Amino acid sequence: MPLTVDRRPAPALRVVQTRVASADASIDLGDLDGLYRRYSPYVAAVATRLLGRDSEVDDLVQDVFLNALAGISRLRDPQAVKGWLAKVTVRLAVRRLRKRRLLQTFQLSSEIDYQQLAAADTSPEQKALLVKVYRALDLMPARTRVIWLLRNLLGEPLHAIVELTACSQSTVQRKLRDAEDHLTRELDHA
């Protein structure tokens, strides 16, 4: 069964992106509280999709803005803050996924309830598929998982994924193929 994916960003993320884009006109990099209020919904939306676990999102958002506090002075263009925060979110999500996988290897992590990610009006069949996909994603290397989610769940174009992950375009394309192959195998056997 070939895996087909709607490459448009998820509706909730599109709403957040629209709000953030309209607010980008005046950005004060010295106002971290204002940056947090403006961009934390966007960072949380990206983190939720990458991690697949709501319980870790708040911690990741805080970590992203702690990194922002330390690194915001190096940002030259205030209009680039959203992309920079996305890049920090991706980097920290990859670290967190690697740590989670290590803990699962030694059975030090609890089972994840992926059904909580589904919208209230999601059918039982769709919830079951969501659980299967995220469980298959759990078996992937963290960076491969994140690249696949950026492309297929968040709808990011290749050039944006290259920028967000600091990988070459050929590496991103290879990891996308690897992820598709892995998901096809796992979902066919599930």
Where are these regions (language model features)?
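A short, charge-rich alpha-helical start-of-domain segment used by transcription regulators
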Residues: A21-A45, S55, L69, V133-R135, ...
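Short, Lys/Arg-enriched C-terminal cap helix and immediately downstream tail that follows
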Residues: R98, M140, D178-A190
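Arg/Lys-rich amphipathic alpha helix in sigma70-family domain 2
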Residues: S73-R76, K87-L108, Q126
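Helix-turn-helix DNA-binding module
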Residues: D138, A142-V146, L154-R174, D181-H182
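Structural recognition of an alpha-helix C-terminal capping motif at a helix-to-coil junction
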Residues: D59-L66, Q79-R91
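Internal acidic/polar
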Residues: A10-R19, L103-Q126, L130
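Sigma70-family region 2
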Residues: D24-A25, F65-V81, K99-R101
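Short helix-capping/turn signature of helix-turn-helix
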Residues: L13, R38-S40, L50, L149-P157, ...
